Amino acid sequence: YTPEQKATYPIYNQHPYVGNLTLGLTSLVKNEDRANSLELQLGTTGTNSLAKGSQHFIHKLWGMEQWPGWANQLPGEITANLFFKRYYRLRGLEKRYGSGFETDALAYWHADAGTVKVQAGGGMSFRFGYNLGNTSPENSIRGATSAAPPFVYNRMSVSNWGYYGYIHAAVRAVAHDLYLDGTVFRSSPKYVNKYPVVGEWGYGFGLRYKRSELLFGLHYMTKEYTQQESMQCVGVLQLRHTF
């Protein structure tokens, strides 16, 4: 993350420079209608996160301007976070039409706790398309479980190929956000005042061949802190393969 303006000195009332390099381990227990996901993420902020070098590489690759203020990034700190998510299959929205066209949906709630995020919320995703097969409408931009179907599906495929569109909406209440509030165990400046509630919605498209999927989407988030000029738009690009 970087502020909106480029400068070599700290810019208050804007997002601080911060990166977090993480490694996650996820347990997913599921049946045909419910699923529980528990993920542990360990990581580090500061120079060990490699955020500066990663951003400079991507900006150079695409011919974009560099941001010079990484000397002011939040200090290095070991991070640890637990993410719990409970999924519900919405069978009432599962419909099968002629020629292989289908709809499906899921809802979920989640609770996260640790040094990076302390928050809770819920959301819903809805899909419509051709030959959905044994894939799912899960399309989160956070966590590792978005790559795995959260339910045990037994749907028949009418072709090796499939395609779909999706829409998604979610809301969460945020008590702590390291990226806005600063590090927990090391002193860091307070740059912004965050909002306690954040909304998110998005849409996208997916293409499936047998057990592999390519997904692209755009997700929009309401302002996360009071001085933020506009909402965020995050692009999602995922390549999935189910074994």
PLM segments and residue spans:
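Short loop/turn motifs that connect adjacent beta-strands in outer-membrane beta-barrel proteins
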Residues: 30-37, 90-105, 131-142, 152-162
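Long, hydrophobic/aromatic-enriched structural stretches that serve as scaffold segments
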Residues: 1-54
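Transmembrane beta-barrel strands of outer-membrane/channel proteins
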Residues: 1, 40-46, 86, 107-115, ...
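Transmembrane beta-barrel domains of outer membrane proteins
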Residues: 26-28, 85-89, 125-129, 202-208, ...
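Extracellular loop and loop/strand-boundary signature of outer-membrane beta-barrel proteins
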Residues: 9-12, 66-72, 110, 187-191, ...
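Outer membrane beta-barrel transmembrane domains
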Residues: 4-5, 131-243
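Residues that define the transmembrane beta-barrel architecture of outer-membrane proteins
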Residues: 17-21, 36, 76-82, 103-105, ...
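Transmembrane beta-strands of outer-membrane beta-barrel proteins
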Residues: 36-42, 82, 96-99, 103-111, ...
